[in-house]
């Protein structure tokens, strides 16, 4: 008969369970497991107290302390031991569930629960005081030592495992795959007070920060990011983070770069695809790994790299957004987040400079990342109808204590005006501060209008003003985008330009090598190729992180749509004309708010599909309202940038997007004001105040000319153009026409002169024997000059063609301004000069092997010139034009019209045009004869009747109010079209200030009348001009 197993008492069962959990025994054991520790001293103490050698809940903590404090060989270090205790307690609690005795099961559940709680508690004690129990594997020391240590907190691998990471080796932590026992981390972080966890959490944040330093987007940044989010989601974790001394680092030498390197979040924001300075380079190298020798890679490989980078960056953006959002939702941490953002922005204000110091400023990657995160924070108030824009208070820009906005260049106000206005406004509103703050407090009840306190210290009345979170987020995002996304786009543009120039230089070097090889040239070529390779990699990195991320661009466009709608609200909404006085709230706003919007629109317009689904109407109306309003937007280059946006949107063909066509052809503001404002800006841009204004204007006018040519084809805009020409015949339209003529003459003259230089260099180079005899340096310089001149001619000739084209199509229907007394001679001189160049004796010197290469189309140019002649002749009802043609002493010759007609017949011009052109030539010849007769009849003209500028007989003398000198009205008015100053003393002068000299006019009229009645002496030559011989052979245009 089998013997029954003896029944164990509850005390014995409890002892067995606790020995299993804590790996200890009070009696010598034969167990071979080295982890089980015999607590000999503890056992002796228990026996001396007259107790049984059984572990119990009453002895549990005592036994645990003795185990942790003792020096036992082969025993586990404290932290892994305690984790093991918790895990074994959990396992035992599962086994207990099979006990049939409910009372015993309940008692044992209490035991295992107490054991788990004790294990968690002593984990905290150990981590907070690593030296308490000895046998610690963590180094001690100050902050610097902790920053440099290789080993991270033993809690970190458990958190990584909890949030689902992969290998942990790269973080300096154990890769044993150890995981926290179920429920351990919840108990560890949530069932405790702040003080006991604060130091542990702070060390965890330092460890997380260290794991991502110098990690690029291709590195394993996701586990630390998920761990960061996990810790911040704990109320105690959020509080500990923002109270860390590295949350907003302080110090006498704390600049933007130092803040990026030393703050807790800085290294997370540094993770990027964008290359950084070599001192702060991240690994793996994105450019080298994804885009080396990109020209030799398959398109599919590049697209794959673009997609990978975009996806990883969006994981980073989302994670960082979640972290900030968690912190912002809590009133306990929101203020510190806003403080951090403001400090980062202010410390990096110099990132807006053209040249950025990489040692004192944070990386471009950090600010592009911050741009993406801020845009995500803005999404709740970027709804289609922008319903929350009234929460944005313009006074934040001037009175807000966080951001230094009042020092930035304003849209119109000077820095002195901004300072004065802020002072006056502060005084005027001092009594209202309390009431306004009360209203803001009520707004705090709304989730959308969550407010942040305006100053952590609350030191003065100014900082007592509270602004809604929407308001703070709006202005911070505007600043971050300026220093981040828009700066990166600017860098991308300059990088592309540098690459283009580098490729041109490389081509020049290779051409020079072909002509005269040398070791130095080989070195230069090799160096240039390496530089271009690195620049190409950097350009593709920018493209991958920014331009290929359509959501990023569209979020930014949505933000700037809010920006322009809000700005327009400051001046009364989308309506014209604008108020006569610019409101100071608008005038004092930072200029970059508008400039950034325009820059982004230009970039987005050049990215396929970037504008799909983006409402552009508000942008269009904003541009029309302000592009010709210097009283609102002082900077002419900013207004010119608005035109560049329109130029990007301009439909290029009949198949162009109907959406952009509607912008130009279906909007009331566009139909009424677009042509008018383009013409006005064309005039305004003559004087920008910059030392490069002379050359800048040509690029700006090129964009305007393209738009005007397109708008001329739209009937509604052409009608508006006619009305403007009639209403402003002696105003802005006459100024526009004057500058158009000036530009045409200058550009064509420059082009033709440089063509002669190019031909000379070509001739030199074609004489191989002589060319090879020249010094190498001379040949290199001449070759560089040759390529430079080619580019200049190509650009100048393109611009000249545009100007002549505009003169041609507008003169078909608008002729009156061309024929005004102050304008007609200028126009005639221009046409004569062009005609002389195209059919005169020097035409052969302008023949080129490949004229199309230089945009030089002499046949087309001649046809347009002749059409302008004919158009003006048709509109000349008072027969003033022939006399203006023949009075040109520089270029006119009657034989030019015959020569021009011969060429026109050869190139197939309409017979009717040729006939009218010849008739105009006949009239000009007759006018020349009449002028000679009249001049002879007048004889010697008294000096007082001569205009002091051109020394011709005055017909309408006027007195200049400042210098009191009398001049001929048409001559001074022509001068005023380009320069509104008295030519004799530079005093300000306008047409309406001229004083008619009635007495002198009467004398001149009497003088002319008396001499015309006399019989003119005969025998004089009909012309003293030197004849210009023309032939019909060897024509430039054949």
UniProtKB/Swiss-Prot annotation:
GO molecular function: ubiquitin protein ligase activity; ubiquitin-ubiquitin ligase activity
SMART domains for this protein: Ubox
Ranges of residues in domain U-box: 940-1014
Entry EC no(s): 2.3.2.27
Reaction(s) catalysed (UniProt annotation): S-ubiquitinyl-[E2 ubiquitin-conjugating enzyme]-L-cysteine + [acceptor protein]-L-lysine = [E2 ubiquitin-conjugating enzyme]-L-cysteine + N(6)-ubiquitinyl-[acceptor protein]-L-lysine
Subcellular location: Cytoplasm; Nucleus
Biased composition (Polar residues): 1029-1038
Main location: cytoplasm
Region annotation (Disordered) ranges: 430-459, 1010-1038
Transmembrane segment boundaries: none
Gene Ontology biological process terms from the UniProt entry: ERAD pathway; protein ubiquitination; ubiquitin-dependent protein catabolic process
CDD domains found in the cross-reference section: RING-Ubox_UBE4A
Broad enzyme group: transferase
Keywords noted in UniProt: Cytoplasm, Nucleus, Transferase, Ubl conjugation pathway
Biased composition (Low complexity): 446-459
Record's compositionally biased regions (Basic and acidic residues): 1017-1028
GO cellular component, one term: cytoplasm
Associated pathway: Protein modification; protein ubiquitination
Free-text function comment from the UniProt entry: Ubiquitin-protein ligase that may function as an E3 ligase in conjunction with specific E1 and E2 ligases. May also function as an E4 ligase mediating the assembly of polyubiquitin chain assembly on substrates monoubiquitinated by another E3 ubiquitin ligase.
Family named by the database record: Belongs to the ubiquitin conjugation factor E4 family.
Domain comment quoted from the record: The U-box domain is required for the ubiquitin protein ligase activity.
Name assigned to this protein: Probable ubiquitin conjugation factor E4
């Amino acid at each position: 008969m089998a013997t029954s197993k003896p029944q164990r008492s509850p005390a014995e069962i409890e002892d067995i369970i606790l020995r299993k959990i804590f790996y200890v025994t009070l009696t010598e054991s034969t167990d071979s497991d080295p982890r089980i520790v015999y607590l000999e001293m503890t056992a002796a103490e228990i026996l001396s107290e007259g107790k049984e050698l059984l572990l119990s809940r009453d002895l549990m903590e005592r036994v645990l302390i003795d185990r942790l404090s003792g020096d036992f060989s082969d025993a586990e270090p404290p932290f892994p031991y305690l984790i093991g205790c918790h895990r074994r307690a959990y396992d035992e609690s599962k086994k207990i569930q099979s006990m049939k005795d409910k009372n015993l099961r309940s008692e044992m559940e209490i035991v295992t629960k107490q054991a788990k709680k004790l294990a968690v508690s002593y984990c905290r004690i150990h981590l907070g005081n690593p030296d308490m129990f000895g046998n610690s594997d963590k180094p001690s020391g100050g902050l610097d030592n902790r920053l440099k240590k290789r080993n991270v907190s033993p809690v970190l691998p458990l958190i990584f495992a909890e949030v689902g990471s992969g290998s942990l080796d790269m973080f300096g932590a154990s890769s044993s795959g150890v995981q926290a026992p179920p429920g351990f981390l919840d108990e560890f972080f949530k069932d405790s007070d702040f003080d006991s966890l604060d130091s542990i959490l702070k060390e965890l944040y330092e460890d997380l920060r260290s794991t991502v330093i110098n990690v690029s987007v291709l590195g394993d940044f996701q586990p630390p990011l998920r761990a960061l989010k996990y810790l911040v989601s704990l109320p105690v974790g959020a509080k500990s983070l923002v109270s860390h001394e590295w949350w907003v680092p302080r110090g006498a030498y704390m600049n933007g770069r130092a803040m990026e390197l030393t703050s807790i979040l800085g290294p997370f924001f540094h993770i990027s695809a964008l290359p950084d300075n070599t001192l702060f380079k991240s690994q793996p190298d994105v450019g080298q790994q994804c885009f080396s020798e990109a020209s030799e890679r398959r398109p599919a490989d590049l697209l794959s790299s673009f997609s990978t980078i975009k996806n990883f960056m969006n994981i980073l953006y989302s994670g960082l957004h979640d972290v900030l959002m968690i912190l912002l939702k809590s009133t306990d941490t929101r203020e510190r987040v806003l403080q951090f953002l403001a400090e980062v922005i202010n410390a990096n204000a110099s990132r807006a400079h053209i040249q950025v110091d990489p040692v004192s400023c944070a990386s471009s990657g950090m600010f592009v990342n911050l741009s993406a995160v801020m845009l995500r924070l803005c999404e709740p108030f970027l709804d289609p109808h922008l319903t929350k824009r009234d929460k944005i208070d313009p006074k934040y820009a001037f009175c807000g204590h966080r951001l230094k906005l009042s020092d930035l260049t304003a849209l119109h106000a000077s820095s002195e005006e901004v300072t004065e206005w802020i002072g006056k406004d502060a005084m005027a509103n001092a009594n209202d501060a309390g009431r306004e703050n009360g209203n803001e407090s009520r707004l705090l009840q709304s989730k959308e209008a969550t407010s942040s306190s305006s100053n952590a210290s609350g030191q003065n009345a100014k900082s007592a003003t509270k602004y809604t979170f929407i308001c703070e987020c709006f202005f911070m995002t505007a600043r971050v985008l300026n220093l981040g996304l828009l700066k990166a786009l600017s860098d991308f543009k300059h990088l592309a330009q540098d690459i283009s120039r580098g490729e041109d230089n490389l081509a020049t070097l290779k051409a020079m090598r072909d002509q005269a090889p040398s070791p130095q040239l080989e070195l230069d070529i090799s160096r240039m190729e390496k530089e271009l390779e690195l620049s190409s990699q950097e350009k593709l990195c920018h493209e991958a992180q920014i331009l290929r991320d359509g959501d990023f661009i569209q979020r930014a466009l949505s933000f700037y749509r809010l920006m322009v709608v809000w700005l327009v609200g400051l001046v009364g909404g989308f309506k014209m004309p604008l108020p006569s006085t610019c409101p100071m709230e608008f005038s004092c706003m930072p200029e970059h708010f508008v400039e950034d919007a325009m820059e982004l629109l230009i970039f987005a317009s050049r990215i396929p599909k970037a504008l799909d689904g983006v409402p552009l109407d508000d942008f269009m109306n904003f541009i029309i309202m302000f592009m010709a309003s210097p009283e609102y937007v002082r900077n002419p280059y900013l207004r010119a940038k608005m035109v560049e946006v329109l130029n990007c949107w301009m439909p290029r063909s009949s198949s162009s997007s109907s959406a952009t066509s509607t912008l130009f052809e279906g909007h009331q503001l566009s139909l009424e004001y677009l042509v008018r404002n383009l013409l006005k800006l064309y005039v305004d841009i003559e004087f920008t105040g910059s030392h490069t204004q002379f050359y800048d204007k040509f690029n700006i006018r090129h964009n305007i000319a393209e738009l005007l040519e397109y708008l001329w084809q739209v009937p509604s805009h052409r009608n508006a153009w006619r009305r403007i020409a009639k209403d402003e015949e002696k105003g802005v339209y006459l100024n526009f026409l004057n500058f158009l003529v000036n530009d045409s003459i200058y550009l064509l003259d420059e082009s033709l002169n440089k063509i002669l230089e190019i031909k000379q260099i070509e001739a030199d180079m074609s004489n191989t024997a002589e060319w090879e005899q020249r010094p190498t340096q001379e040949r290199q310089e001449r070759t560089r000059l040759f390529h430079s001149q080619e580019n200049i001619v190509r650009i100048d000739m393109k611009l000249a063609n545009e100007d002549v084209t505009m003169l041609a199509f507008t003169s078909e229907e608008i002729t009156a301004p061309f024929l005004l007394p102050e304008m007609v001679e200028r126009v005639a001189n221009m046409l004569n000069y062009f005609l002389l160049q195209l059919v005169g004796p020097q035409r052969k010197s302008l023949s080129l092997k490949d004229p199309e290469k230089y945009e030089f189309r002499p046949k087309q140019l001649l046809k347009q010139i002749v059409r302008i002649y004919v158009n003006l002749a048709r509109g000349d009802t008072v027969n003033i034009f022939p006399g203006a043609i023949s009075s040109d002493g520089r270029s006119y010759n009657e034989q030019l019209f015959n020569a021009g007609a011969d060429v026109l017949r050869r190139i197939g011009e309409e017979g009717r045009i040729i006939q009218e052109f010849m008739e105009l030539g006949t009239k000009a010849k007759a006018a020349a004869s009449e002028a000679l007769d009249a001049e002879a009849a007048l004889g010697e003209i008294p000096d007082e009747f001569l205009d002091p500028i051109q020394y011709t007989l005055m017909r309408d003398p006027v007195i200049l109010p400042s210098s009191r000198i009398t001049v001929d009205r048409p001559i001074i008015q022509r001068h005023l079209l380009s320069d509104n100053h008295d030519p004799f003393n530079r005093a300000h002068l306008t047409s309406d200030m001229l004083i008619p000299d009635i007495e002198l006019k009467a004398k001149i009229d009497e003088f002319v009348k008396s001499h015309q009645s006399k019989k003119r002496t005969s025998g004089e030559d009909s012309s003293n001009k030197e004849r210009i011989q023309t032939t019909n052979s060897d024509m430039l245009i054949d």
